[in-house]
Amino acid sequence: MMKKTDYITTEDFSKEELLKLVDLSLKIKACIKNGYYPPLLEHKSLGMIFQQTSTRTRVSFETAMSQLGGHAQYLAPGQIQLGGHETIEDTSTVLSRLDDILMARVERHQSVVDLARCASIPVINGMSDYNHPTQELGDLCTMIEHLPAGKKLEDCKVVFVGDATQVCFSLALITTKMGMEFVHFGPKGFQLNDMHKEKLDKICERSGGKYTVTDNEDAIEGADFLYTDVWYGLYEAELSEEERMQIFFPKYQVDSQMMAKAGADCKFMHCLPATRGEEITDEVMDGPHSICFDEAENRLTSIRGLLVYLLRDYREKNPYDLVKQEKAKEELETFLKPE
């Protein structure tokens, strides 16, 4: 049996593997745009575990499975307790026998790590308090589709504005792995921390990428992509609106002046959902430089590719499999024959 592949963090994948995954995703997207839905996931079943509610992640996974011939099962918050009444080991063992692949959106990163460790089928991290790796893939697809004329990916500069959310760290991981320049422009106390920097240092040593963490707004100049997220962490006590505005507004709000400072050709990105009037203005979000809705569509694009990539036949074929299959088929047909 070949070893299964999990998708828990892009740190486990090489630049070449990630680019191959994106290329696969974009090729499937082109097929579907032209009316052909390749049945690449026919008879495959995805179990989706959600400890947090979701819009884009849930819809993208369900649609991806349906479009490619498979089926997705939604296990809502409260319907399944990872490590609660039933142990993670038991849950993963049972679901490994019922499904072909699992996706889990969890509160604690260790939960999805443990799920993957115990499952005999591939496991995808749909988001945790550590990272958001499926968002990374969608972002990479989007940046490749919107590359500035005459530039390669590694020539591009990406600036993240605001709070050091999971999305901020995930964007830092994928861009530096691609050899790009990443800047986190955010207030002190809400910047990428020493743990994040240690991981980015190791990636940059191998990739040639570079990163900067600063509260100096001059760092946004020359950006090819300007990215922001909401001004509060998902898994800590949320700041009140008044506290958020005192810390981040107006310096870290992406408005037309900030976009102009970044550069005339800079594109705007946001993982969504957005809090209009806080981290982003309507003028920018709905403006000609915004690609955030292309980015949202590419969640589906990249998830289709990811599912196909992970569900390659990792179970090595036994030479007797075909014989057993034919025998089982014959026995079933005999049983179903009318008397």
UniProtKB/Swiss-Prot annotation:
It comes from Streptococcus mutans serotype c (strain ATCC 700610 / UA159). Induction: Up-regulated by agmatine. Expressed under the control of carbohydrate catabolite repression. Pathway: Amine and polyamine biosynthesis; putrescine biosynthesis via agmatine pathway; putrescine from N-carbamoylputrescine (transferase route): step 1/1. InterPro entries: Asp/Orn_carbamoyltranf_P-bd, Asp/Orn_carbamoylTrfase, Asp/Orn_carbamoylTrfase_sf, Asp_carbamoyltransf_Asp/Orn-bd, Orn/put_carbamltrans, PtcA. PANTHER family: ORNITHINE CARBAMOYLTRANSFERASE, MITOCHONDRIAL, ORNITHINE TRANSCARBAMYLASE, MITOCHONDRIAL. The keyword Transferase applies. It comes from the Bacteria. This is Putrescine carbamoyltransferase.
